[in-house]
């Protein structure tokens, strides 16, 4: 039983190594951006549709490799054009809010040009702003569309419809009204409003001035052409996402949706959820998302699809409302919304409350352990607003967690201290019963009972730290609030690895290490490794040589493992190790137990000197 505690430590440590190793070596960093540069040049007379009748994009819209306007039939197709050229193909109404800028094309009335004012590609404010939505004709179109589908209703608004606008600006407090008459008795009016953050409200009115009843189905969709670059981590979902009524959260990666059965036509796969009430659908990246939000009290059909057009994969999430029948001289109004922006936690929650959007908070991937990650974020966010620095918030939350678990940790360390005090008796028992394991275990148990020692109590501090570690890791990895959040000194982004490198002596040598060098080891991972080394040297080495070797290499393994982890996580671990060392030192001194740190360090250097002398 004497080695049970050590075996437990080894098992826990090895489990962590396996988990971190899987993350580091298998899931890996970001996968290659999959740019699609070719698309079928087949001429089409009408837009293809999914099984629910919602339009699916086609090459004739001016996408990659579609013939340019004015090109003769059979002429060579041109490739994607710049965003500027694509935007210039249609008259546009400008979007300008405190958080967004962009435009809506009057041709098609899609929301297909949105950039984020307050977010940049890198830490530098001089770097380009984040571009979220882009029109067809660019390399990777990404847009939202609203409209109506139906049979025997005459022409309906589509990607080629030219709308009339009542103004040249869409801004908070300045809605935009678009109108179009199909010439056969249907008049369409669309009022688009935007708030000061990331929510568009689209109010569609249709009036039937004909002599016949008309049945229409309102829809909204988010469409993305080409598979984007993804992070490729198992702790993060990127791709198609939605909440579909009672079916709850649905998450489909770009690869997964393409494995679904055929849906509505050739080269289209997907899945639909029918007759659901409450929810939303969209496409999400790590920090950004676009989501179509139907009326929450009316049933709808939601769908995720992938359509192959030439070499291009087109991903689409859509909602289609129930039928609306318009009698002659009757009208109908449908209100839908579009979220297009940064996944700010407080803003997402505010939208959920304001508009009653079912489980809109699941737009952020809190994971299975949301009951840990959400409180962790709340605590960090609270102290950030109090102190103004997320790094300091991490240190303070770690200290509070230490104080919260102090009774458990104290009992564990007291038990460990008692165990050290009886080490001579334990050694004597092992020698006395070295040939009889049963009697040895019985004698050990009697000793533990006599001295009131829990042999596995020392495992609790480690076990407690594991869920906290992963909760903090999740928060650092998924929340945009941590993106580009500085600490002090060289740490300007707590969500990114320590930017320094041992390869150039942490910046002392005048060159930047090339990215292909597999060793990424900065200052903070080394500090963490040192604190872990000191913590392990507080205890005597395990008697088993194999276990001793495992413990000796553990700080080195974790130092390299955490080299590519977010700096905030490494800072947390180093700080937590430091607090643990202080706590253990105080408890051991109070219990009259000798602290082994200095003896272990001296012994290590003596062994090193003896080995060097022997080789000499």
From Swiss-Prot:
Could you tell me which CDD domains the record lists for this protein?
5TM_YidC_Alb3 (cd20070), EcYidC-like_peri (cd19961)
Task: Kindly give the Gene3D superfamilies that the UniProt entry links to this protein.
Answer: 2.70.98.90
Q: Which Gene Ontology cellular component annotation is one that this UniProt entry carries?
A: plasma membrane
Keywords carried by this UniProt record: Cell inner membrane, Cell membrane, Chaperone, Membrane, Protein transport, Transmembrane, Transmembrane helix, Transport
Which cell locations does it reside in? Cell inner membrane
User: What is the recorded membrane topology of this protein?
Assistant: Multi-pass membrane protein
Q: What is its main location?
A: membrane
- The residue ranges flagged as biased composition, category Low complexity, are 36-51, 62-80
Q: Which family does the similarity line name? A: Belongs to the OXA1/ALB3/YidC family. Type 1 subfamily.
| Name this polypeptide is given | Membrane protein insertase YidC
Please tell me the species this chain comes from: Methylorubrum extorquens (strain PA1) (Methylobacterium extorquens)
Gene transcribed to yield this protein: yidC
């Amino acid at each position: 039983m004497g080695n049970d505690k050590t075996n437990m430590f080894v098992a826990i440590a090895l489990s962590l190594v396996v988990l971190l190793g899987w993350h580091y070596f298998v899931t890996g960093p970001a996968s290659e951006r999959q740019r699609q540069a070719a698309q079928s040049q087949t001429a089409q007379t009408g837009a293809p549709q999914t099984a629910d009748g919602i339009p699916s994009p086609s090459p004739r819209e001016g996408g990659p490799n579609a013939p340019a306007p004015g090109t003769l039939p059979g002429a060579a197709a041109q490739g994607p054009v710049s965003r500027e050229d694509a935007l210039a193909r249609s008259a546009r109404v400008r979007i300008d809010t405190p958080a967004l800028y962009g435009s809506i094309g009057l041709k098609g009335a899609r929301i297909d040009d949105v950039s984020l004012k307050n977010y940049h590609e890198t830490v530098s404010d001089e770097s380009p702003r984040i571009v979220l939505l882009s029109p067809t004709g660019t390399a990777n179109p990404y847009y939202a569309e609203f409209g109506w589908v139906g049979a025997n209703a005459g022409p309906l608004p589509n990607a080629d419809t030219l709308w009339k606008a009542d103004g040249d600006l869409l801004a908070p407090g300045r809605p935009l009204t678009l109108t179009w008459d199909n010439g056969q008795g249907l008049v369409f009016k669309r009022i688009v409003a935007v708030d000061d953050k990331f929510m568009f409200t689209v109010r569609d009115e249709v009036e039937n001035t004909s002599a016949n009843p008309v049945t229409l189905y309102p829809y909204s969709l988010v469409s993305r052409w080409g598979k984007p670059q993804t992070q490729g981590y198992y702790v993060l979902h990127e791709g198609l996402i939605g909440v579909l009524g009672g079916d709850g959260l649905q998450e489909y990666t770009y690869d997964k949706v393409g494995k679904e059965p055929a849906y509505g036509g050739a080269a289209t796969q997907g899945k639909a959820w029918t007759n659901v009430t409450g929810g939303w659908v969209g496409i999400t990246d790590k920090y950004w998302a676009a989501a179509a939000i139907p009326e929450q009290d009316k049933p709808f059909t939601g769908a995720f699809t992938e359509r192959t057009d030439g070499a291009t994969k087109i991903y689409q999430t859509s909602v289609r409302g129930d039928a609306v029948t318009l009698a002659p001289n009757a009208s109908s109004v449908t209100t839908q919304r579009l979220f297009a922006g940064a996944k700010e936690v407080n803003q997402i929650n505010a939208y959920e409350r304001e508009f009653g959007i079912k489980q809109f908070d699941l737009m952020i991937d809190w994971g299975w352990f949301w009951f840990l990650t959400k409180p962790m974020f709340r605590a960090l966010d609270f102290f950030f607003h109090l102190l103004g620095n997320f790094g300091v918030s991490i240190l303070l939350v770690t200290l509070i967690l230490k104080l919260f678990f102090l009774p458990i940790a104290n009992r564990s360390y007291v038990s460990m201290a008692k165990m050290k005090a009886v080490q001579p008796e334990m050694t004597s028992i092992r020698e006395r019963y070295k040939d009889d394991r049963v009697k040895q275990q019985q004698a050990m148990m009697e000793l533990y009972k006599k001295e009131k020692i829990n042999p596995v109590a020392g495992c609790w501090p480690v076990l407690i730290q594991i869920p906290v570690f992963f909760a903090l890791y999740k928060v650092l990895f998924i929340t945009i609030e941590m993106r580009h959040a500085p600490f002090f000194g060289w740490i300007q982004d707590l969500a990114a690895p320590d930017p320094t490198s041992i390869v150039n002596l942490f910046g002392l040598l005048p060159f930047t290490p090339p990215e292909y060098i597999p060793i990424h080891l900065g200052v903070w991972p080394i500090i963490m490794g040192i604190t872990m080394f000191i913590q392990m040297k507080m205890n005597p080495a395990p008697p088993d040589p194999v276990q001793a070797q495992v413990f000796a290499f553990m700080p080195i393994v974790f130092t390299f493992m955490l080299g590519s982890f977010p700096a905030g996580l490494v800072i947390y671990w180093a700080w937590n190790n430091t607090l643990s060392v202080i706590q253990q030192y105080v408890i051991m001194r109070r219990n009259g137990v000798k602290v082994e740190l200095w003896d272990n360090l001296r012994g290590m250097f003596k062994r090193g000197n003896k080995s060097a002398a022997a080789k000499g």
